[in-house]
Amino acid sequence: MKVRASVKRICRNCKIVKREGVVRVLCTDPKHKQRQG
């Protein structure tokens, strides 16, 4: 899980999801998981 100020899709499988006011990126590749913070 990477914590970044700006989350972006890295590949086409990445999905941007907003959970409880936190923007997250979910992907089939675990290295692409990100959270805004």
From Swiss-Prot:
- Recorded superkingdom: Bacteria
What GO MF annotations does this protein's record show?
structural constituent of ribosome
| GO BP annotations listed | translation
Which InterPro entries does this UniProt record tie to the protein? Ribosomal_bL36, Ribosomal_bL36_sp
Which positions carry the signal peptide feature in this UniProt record?
Answer: none
Q: Name a GO CC annotation attached to this entry.
A: cytoplasm
The record's SUPFAM superfamilies line, in alphabetical order, gives: Ribosomal protein L36
What's in the keyword line of the UniProt record? Ribonucleoprotein, Ribosomal protein
Check the record and name the PROSITE patterns matching this protein.
RIBOSOMAL_L36
Q: Name one Pfam family in it.
A: Ribosomal_L36
The cysteines joined by S-S bonds are: none
Family per similarity comment: Belongs to the bacterial ribosomal protein bL36 family.
Protein name in UniProt:
Large ribosomal subunit protein bL36
Organism of origin is Actinobacillus succinogenes (strain ATCC 55618 / DSM 22257 / CCUG 43843 / 130Z)
* The organism's taxonomic lineage, starting at the top: Bacteria, Pseudomonadati, Pseudomonadota, Gammaproteobacteria, Pasteurellales
